Amino acid sequence: MRILLAAAVAAAAVAAPAFAQDAAPFTGARLGVTLGYDKTHDRDGFTYGGAFGYDYAVAPKITLGAEATFEDSTTKGDGIRASRDVAISARAGYVLTPKLLAFAKVGYDTTRFEIADEGHNNLEGVRYGGGLEYSVTPRTYISAEYRRTEYEDHFGGRDAGIVGAGFRF
């Protein structure tokens, strides 16, 4: 009986790894850097910063997540300079291939604009956009996205084309 029990335990131990599955792609916490082209009020420049997010697979090909970005910009002209930019967004993604995710996002944004002879003004708005994320390795990714921010008080909008790279952990 002991031999039978030992054989059963050994068989279960050998078979257990077969039940283990890799984590769904594009899930978990992520941290990355961003760089891109930024345009506000017919003035353009560069934007740069970082992003932190968390994504969860709700179905084999669908992810939902949240993201926070912290960026700065070189965009300036006519006495106005775009400065610090902080956004919090919800993100939904669809896995096109095991290495490629298409995503859309929408969220809240606040940007500081430095105004000559007046100091600064913080504007809030709605940010939306979409893009692609490519899994270079199971823990590293590169991404490209377009996003638009519509500010309050008829200030207008801001467009950005962003590329990024980061790690999942």
Predicted segments with their positions:
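Gram-negative outer-membrane beta-barrel domains
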Residues: 17-169
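Cleavable N-terminal export/targeting peptides
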Residues: 1-26
